[in-house]
Amino acid sequence: MRGGLRHPKQAWSDTRLVQACLDGDADAWIALLAKYKNLIYSIAIGYGASQADADDIFQTVCVEFFNGLPALRRVESLPAWLASVTRHRSFHWRRLTSTRATREGTTLEDAPPTRLAVVEDDVVERAQRDQRIREAIDRLPPRCRRLVQLLFFEQPPRPYADIAGEMGLALGSIAMIRARCLKKLQSAIHEAGL
């Protein structure tokens, strides 16, 4: 797949991914981290981390995630747990950076301004909403799921002719099938409480 979902398992529910991770599926780990990478990076950068420092924070969170996943009691709390771990690691990074700057004779006032911020609840809520949408897509019949992925998750967007060819459909039928699939997706999203 070009762009969009990088890994087929990324569309799996967190419950399914967590179980696969606990069963030793390396691809499930890759998919689970890909799903929450933006959440982790947004928190680290919100604490003023550079890209390199955010990379380090991400790696530290991944290690803690790997070690802590077997103890996770409720999969639904995964985004909030990851946000909490990331805030803690980002705060720790910020404290070390501040201490190092003080030893080197600079102060935080001398440093460029940063957005030292506690991630707002809406970031976690957005991650949870996105997860419920991915789960709704995952519940679609295979043809609808694939069509939704091709139409809405590919970057750059692909022409209908390419999609029709890949799926073995008549070009003129794509719009009608798309409408039916979107209606099914709307029902699945409604069932998910969105």
Can you name each region flagged by the protein language model?
Residues 10-11, 100-123:
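Internal acidic/polar
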Residues 37, 41, 62, 145, ...:
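C-terminal flanking helix
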Residues 87, 91, 160-191:
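DNA-recognition helix of helix-turn-helix
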Residues 16-21, 132-141:
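Short amphipathic alpha-helical boundary/capping segments
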Residues 56-63, 76-88, 176:
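Structural recognition of an alpha-helix C-terminal capping motif at a helix-to-coil junction
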Residues 2-8, 22-30, 41-60, 71, ...:
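Short, charged helix-capping/linker segments at alpha-helix termini
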Residues 70-74, 84-105, 126:
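Arg/Lys-rich amphipathic alpha helix in sigma70-family domain 2
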Residues 33, 137-162:
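Short amphipathic alpha helix immediately N-terminal
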